[in-house]
Amino acid sequence: SDNRQFVSNPYIQSVRYSGGIPILLPLIRSDTMLEQYLRLCDGFLFCGGNDITPLLFGQEPREGIGNTNITLDLFQIRLMKLILSSAKPVFSICRGMQIFNTACQGTMFQDIRYQPGESLDHMQRSDSRSDVSHPVRIERSSRLFSCLGRSVYVNSFHHQAIDRPGVDLKVSALAPDQTIEAIEHSSHPFAIGVQWHPECMFRSSEKMRRLFRGFITAAQN
């Protein structure tokens, strides 16, 4: 909507109960203000939301694309690039991971039907968003491994997926159907994206709490 901006409460509570102070950053059309955001905050969390505008990763819209907002996309991509040029930590969730990938010149499958091979249903139908849907396998060399171990069961609420990871991004977790479930920046101190929603599993999963605590600790340092 043009007249409101919001963040779902689980993101806010997950930051708060991990020792951080949540600050909501509204969409603005000012590069000067973006630089002030960078100075103001110690770490950045990019949340879930709408699909990414296909033109921003070099494609025209295909069947299955959902709602998009190019103004928000461009704002978040500019902010992401600023953060990655600094040493400040960034944790990106679902759409946030897709923004992370797009900002680094990666590409997307506009709908998971376009991914080669047989895919899982990544839009789970359970009543509770904390319910798990499928396992992910985590790379031992990744930062995620120190928080989550070799594998973890996650929830799943997405229909888009990363096709080609962006420049300097490495894949750190995969689903059983080889969908990319997490990425990390190879040279940034703390830049992680996950496709699932750890904020919805925060109360039920110690591993997800460790993930948020790792982000907040990086911001505090």
PLM region descriptions:
Residues 97-100:
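Hydrophobic, aromatic-enriched interface-forming segments
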Residues 94:
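Conserved G/P- and acidic residue-centered "switch" motifs that form tight phosphate/ATP-binding loops
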Residues 192-195:
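Active-site-proximal beta-strand elements of phosphoester/diester hydrolases
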Residues 1-91, 102, 107-109, 113-147, ...:
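N-terminal beta1-alpha1 cap of cysteine-dependent amidohydrolase-like domains
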